[in-house]
Amino acid sequence: ELKAVLLSSLQMQHVVALAGSGTSLGEINGPSMWTLWDHCVNSNPDTGKDERKPTEQAKAVIAEIGYETAVEHENIEALLSRCDAYLQIKKSEQVEKFVSASKAVILKKCSAFLDGADDSKLASHRTFLHRLSRRRVRDSRMKLFTTNYDLCFEHAAGKQGLVLLDGFSFTQPRQFDPRFFLYDIVRRPSTGDEVGNPLEGVFHLYKLHGSVNWDQSSSGDIEIKTDPTPATACLIYPAKGKYQQSYVQPHLELISQYLAALREPNT
């Protein structure tokens, strides 16, 4: 019955998908929230069942901000939230350094796991995009929304010649502008006498929480860059306040696009 419902849903005029952190786990081996805690807090991460040993810096910060591991557990989102709240009422160079170091770790862990990754590990991503990006001409493009920072979907699309419209310009430097979501790609005949037909394999990608390759300048411009710094990377780091951060640009625009997509009939 579930399969029948899903198949009928795919026949609708508008198809919208929402991808969370689970799509980057499994075979591709992206970092989980626990992995981020392990690498931000412990001096001996990835040591299997051995007892974890927090770094001296982490122990000092946890003690200073009053974070209770027994109550809130080993939760990097809760820890960084407590750090942010603490810094709102008291200046602490030690806590600031820990937050900066943690952001650098998160940025690296969400980027590095794809370096040299075997193409077969993205097989599920490739199959998903291949099937949903090739739709009937009369149907709208598939819209994929994700809260992930990583580039799994970008890599999977690139490996099979799919085109993603992600709100960035098509020239260098690639800058973010929401109007690019309104663009489409068509195949024009060589004579130019006929109206073009929509190109197959095109979909929209909306990264609600930003991306590891988005860099925001002091003027507010957002560009695609290979290695942005933790301070300039345009993404919402794990924290309970991420919902409030979603109401600043460009995240507000992306959330608005998501809500608008949900209101479309036949979706």
PLM regions and their residue ranges:
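Short, basic, glycine/proline-bearing loop/turn elements
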Residues: 111-116, 179-180, 241-244
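Gly/serine-rich nucleotide phosphate-binding loop at the start of the catalytic core
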Residues: 1-155, 162-164
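A generic structural signal for short coil/turn motifs at secondary-structure boundaries
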Residues: 26-27, 217, 244
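Residue-level marker of regulatory loop/turn positions in helix-turn-helix DNA-binding domains and
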Residues: 7, 197, 247
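Glycine-rich anion-binding loop/nest that anchors nucleotide
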Residues: 16-22, 148, 207-209, 231-267
